[in-house]
From Swiss-Prot:
It comes from Mus musculus. Signal peptide: none annotated. This is Targeting protein for Xklp2. One of its GO terms (molecular function) is molecular adaptor activity. It is found in: Nucleus; Cytoplasm, Cytoskeleton, Spindle; Cytoplasm, Cytoskeleton, Spindle pole. GO terms for cellular component: aster; axon hillock; cytoplasm; intercellular bridge; microtubule; mitotic spindle; nucleoplasm; nucleus. GO terms for biological process: activation of protein kinase activity; apoptotic process; cell division; microtubule nucleation; mitotic spindle assembly; negative regulation of microtubule depolymerization; regulation of mitotic spindle organization; spindle assembly. The modification N6-acetyllysine is found at K128, K307, K375. Belongs to the TPX2 family. Keywords: Acetylation, Apoptosis, Cell cycle, Cell division, Cytoplasm, Cytoskeleton, Isopeptide bond, Microtubule, Mitosis, Nucleus, Phosphoprotein, Ubl conjugation.
Amino acid sequence: MSQVPTTYSFDAPTDFINFSSLDAEEDTENIDSWFDEKANLENKFLRQRGIGEPFQGKNSLRKAKLQQGFVTPLKAVDNTYHKETEKENLQKQSIPSNDCSSLDAKRAVSGNTPVQPQRRSIRLSAQKDLEQKEKNHVASVEMKAKRCVAPATDCPPQKRMKVSHKKKLEEEEEGSAPATSRKNERETLEKAKGKHTVPGVPPAREKVLKSTEEQEIEKRLRMQQEVVELRRKNEEFKKLALAGPGQPVKKSTSQVTKTVDFHFLTDERIKQHPKNQEEYKEVNFMSELRKHSSTPARGTRGCTIIKPFNLSKGKKRTFDEAASTYVPIAQQVEAFHKRTPNRYHLRNKKDESLLPSKSVNKIARDPQTPILQTKYRTRAVTCKSTAEQEAEELEKLQQYKFKARELDPRIFESGPILPKRAPVKPPTQPVGFDLEIEKRIHERESKKKTEDEQFEFHSRPCPTKILEDVVGVPEKKVIPATVPKSPVFALKNRIRVPIKDEEEEKPVVIKAQPVPHYGVPYKPHIAEARNVEVCPFSFDTRDKERQLQKEKKIKEMQKGEVPKFKALPVPHFDTINLPEKKVKNVTQAEPFSLETDKRGAYKAEMWKHQLEEEQKQQKDAACFKARPNTVIFQEPFVPKKEKKSLAENPSGSLVQEPFQLATERRAKERQELEKKMAEVEAWKLQQLEEVRQQEEEQQKEELARLRKELVHKANPIRKYAAVEVKSSELPLTVPVSPKFSTRFQ
C-alpha cells in the first residue's frame, strides 16, 4: 500500500501561526498560504493514487504536518478567540471532514458569533482591542472562503453511505429542526472551512493498515488534546481567581483522619505503678474548709480564650527541635536532683492577674445549720421492739381457729383402745414349673400314630450336574511359563530377582455334614469329665517364712517393753451381778446326709432319664414317614444351551486374546530400576558437590582470616605539633655595679 513519505519529529512542531498577532493592517492575501500548501499536498496524493474526482482522504489531517494544539501566553483579559480556535482544532481531530453533523453546525455558529465574557473585566481597553481583533478575523475568514472554494461537480455515491452511530443519535436529537436550517448550517461551515471542505465521496472499502509513524502521530495528537484541555481548565480557574471572592465553591474534600488512642475500661481497674502516679500535693485541710460554697452563684462569663486548632501533625521532628543542643544524661540527672519540685514553688501573682478573673456577686445570706452527714451513716434498725412482737402474736392468735374432733364412743366402753389388726395374708400356693421340653414331649406323644405305616418306594430326581458338566474329573493344572536362561557362562551366575507367581485365591468350599441314616439311632457324644487338680503356688513357703519372722519379731518387742501395773476399780458390793447360766439343749439325733448318697441318686436319675430318651428316639427312627411328592408338580428339566462368546471359544476364535510377553515386562522393570539408580546417583553427586562447595568456602574464609591476622600493618607516622620558638619579651639586663668599694664615699 503506497504511502506518502512524511517526516515527523518527537518534539512538538514550532511552525505555527499565532492568530492573535494578526492585525487588519497586515497583508490579508498571504494569510492563507499555509493552508493552501497543505491542500496542494493532499491533492497531489490523490492524483498519485489515480483518483480523478476531488476526494477528501480519511487520514489527510493525520498525515499532514499540522499543528493541532498550541500554547499561548497568559493574559489577564478573557481571550474568547483563543478558546474558539482551540475548540475548532479539537473538533477537527475528533470528527472527519466528510462527516457533517449538528456538532459542526454548532461550531460554525460559535465561530461566527463573538462570545460574551461571563464576568466583567476591569481593563476596558483590553476588551476593546479583543473585539477589534475578532472583527478582523471574521472578515479574513469570509474572504478566504470566497477565494478558495472551487466549483466541483457532486458525484453520485455508488453505494448507500453508512452513517455512524453517533451521527444517528445526534440526528434523532435534532429531528425537530427543519431541513432548511441544516442546509444553511452546512453552507456556513463550508465557507468557514475554506479549501478543506470538499464534496463527500464514499471511500473505498479497504482495510487501512497504519504504520508506526501514523500511530506515533495519533499518539502525539492525543497528547496535544490533553494539553489543550488542561490549558482550558487553568484559564477557567484563573478567571475565578481574578474575579475575587464570590459564592463559595463546594468541594468534596475528604476529612483528614485523626488518630485516636484506644481507651479500654480495664485500664482503669488496674492499679498504677507508684512511679506513674500523680505527684502528691500537700494541702492544708483547715484552709480548705468553707472555701467553696455549697451552691456557687453563676457568674458572668469572661472573654473567650483563644486556643489553637488541634490539627493532625506528622511525627517527624521540626528543624527547631532537631537543632536543640545536646545535653548529656549525667547533666540531666544532676539538674533533676538540684531542681526544687513544683509542689514547693509558690504561685506567681502576676500570672494569676493576667488570667480573666470570674466576677463573683456577693449576696448576703442568713445563717443556716450545716448539712451534717452523720445521721445518714446510721444503720437501719432490724431488731423488733416488744410492742411489735406482741402485735404480731396477737394477729396470729386471731387468725388461729380451733376445730374440735368427733367423740370416739370406744372411750366410754371397757377395755383399752388398741390399734386395728392388719389382715392376714393367705399362704403361698406352690406352682409347678412350665418347661418347654415337657410341652414338646407331650406334642410328640400326641402326634404318634398307634399303627405303623407300610414302607413305600419313591424315586428321586436325576442330578443335573451330570448333564451340565463333567463330574469326577479333576481340573487341569496351569503349568508356569518357562524362564529362559542364557547359555553365556558369565550370565549364568548372575543373581536374578525371584519371580513370585500370583496365587489365585481359591474359593472356600463349605462342606455340609453327611445326612445320617434314618434307621441308625442318634447317640450324643458326652465330653469326658476332667477334674482340675489344685496345685500350691510356688511362693506359699515364702509367705509362711515371712509370717514366722513377723511373729518372732513381735515377741521380741513385747519382751523388751516393761509392763505397767494398772489397778482395777473397786467393785460395788451393793448388788451382785452374776452372769446368766447357759443351759445347753439336748442333742437331737439326725440321720447322716452324705454327698456320695446325693451324687449317686442324681446319677441314677439322670441315667434313667437318658435311657428313656434313647428308647423314644429309637421308636421315632423305626417309624418311617415319607415326604410329600413334589416332583410331579414341577416343570421338567430342560438343559440350557450355553452362550459363549467367540473370544472364549477355544476353537475357531476370531478375536485374539491379549497377552503380555515376559521380555516386555522385564524390559519395563529394568527401565524403572535404571531410572531409580540414575536418580540415586544424581542425588549422591549433588550431595558431594554441596559438601565440596562448603569445604571450599570454609577454606577461603580460613585463608582470609589467616591473612588478616598474619599480615603486618604498620602504624602511620605520628604528626606532632611543630615547636614554635618564641622570642623573649623581657628587656635586656642592664649591668649595675655592686659598689663594694668604699673609696668614693
